Structure formats: structure tokens, C-alpha cells
């Protein structure tokens, strides 16, 4: 049995996806050019706070929420014409999530290098 490590999975994902800096993400949010999606679990939001204006879709249900054939598809809540920018606590889960959504057919999608940890030391407002 050949089981890949999480480190290998993330490395492979990072070679296939778009990663942006916190500063790039902030400019896109400020200019209303994207959907900012927080994929952390609810307890992480409760413990650390939320980024103002970010939509929350937990990693565990992300693909279901973004499947147009799903009964819980985020119809009307996210602008499908704008880039989707995902973040988690540090960038690992969001990298894997972006890879998964690319495989579903999403094209305008990226994740934030450093995730919430990096965002909390930036111009983003935590509420």
C-alpha cells in the first residue's frame, strides 16, 4: 500500500493551484472583485474571530455547498462571475480545497498564503 503523506498532497496541490498573498487578497476584496470564503470550522471562528465580509463554508461541506446540483448550493449567495478566494487557518486545507474545486470545474479560484494567521496581521478587519 502506497499512502501519500499530507505534506506530499499539499505539495502536489500547490503546484496545480493559484496562491495569492494577503495583500493581493485585500485589494481584490476592497475592489469587490471576489468571493472571500472562510473554510475553517465554526469553533475556529468562535475562538479566533471572523474576517469581516467573508462567507463561511466549512471545509467538510465545501464541495456540497458549491455543487450546482446540490440542494444546499449557495445559489445567489456567491457571485459565480467573480474569483473565489479561500482561506483556512494556515493555508493547508485551503490549498487542498482549491485543488478539489478545480477538479469540479471551478476556474477562477485561489487561496491565501498563510491563511487566517497571516490575515490577522494585515489590513483585514477581524470581527
Where in this protein do the model-derived segments appear?
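Rhodanese-like catalytic fold shared by cysteine-dependent sulfurtransferases
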Residues: 1-34, 42-83, 92-127
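Short, surface-exposed ligand- or partner-binding patches at beta-edge/loop junctions that are enriched
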Residues: 87
Amino acid at each position: 500500500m502506497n499512502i501519500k503523506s499530507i505534506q506530499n498532497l499539499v505539495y502536489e496541490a500547490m503546484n496545480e493551484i493559484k496562491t495569492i498573498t494577503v495583500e493581493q487578497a485585500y485589494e481584490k476584496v476592497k475592489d469587490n472583485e471576489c468571493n472571500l470564503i472562510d473554510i475553517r470550522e465554526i469553533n475556529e471562528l468562535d475562538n479566533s474571530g471572523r474576517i469581516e465580509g467573508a462567507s463561511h463554508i466549512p471545509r467538510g461541506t465545501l464541495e456540497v455547498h458549491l455543487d450546482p446540483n446540490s440542494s444546499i448550493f449557495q445559489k445567489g449567495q456567491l457571485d459565480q462571475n467573480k474569483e473565489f478566494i479561500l482561506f483556512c487557518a494556515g493555508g493547508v486545507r485551503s490549498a487542498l480545497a482549491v485543488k478539489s474545486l478545480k477538479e469540479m470545474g471551478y476556474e477562477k479560484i485561489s487561496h491565501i498564503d498563510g491563511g487566517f494567521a497571516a490575515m490577522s496581521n494585515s489590513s483585514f478587519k477581524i470581527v
